């Protein structure tokens, strides 16, 4: 899993981009975490609790995305994922959800989160 962090020089907004199959992680970092160091620390604390068996799993529901942490993996998905459709799609058509959900190992997620935290601290 590769990622890159940038800061928009005009708006000051922090941006995260992740490699294919993990794009939604970039959206979650950018839109749900942003530069909020307290929220970043909260997620890191929950990861430690899971790693030390003080907690089995944890979920953080955001405005647009939800983070689920378990012993072996992290999952980020759009809150709209899995909602029932009010209308029937034609037989050959389907909704594209691949960029609305991503899984990665808990340690990889923790490393990306620590990198994001460092990037934010240096940019503030």
UniProtKB/Swiss-Prot annotation:
Pfam families: UPF0231. NCBIfam families: PRK05248.3-2. Belongs to the UPF0231 family. This is UPF0231 protein Sbal223_3655. It comes from Shewanella baltica (strain OS223).
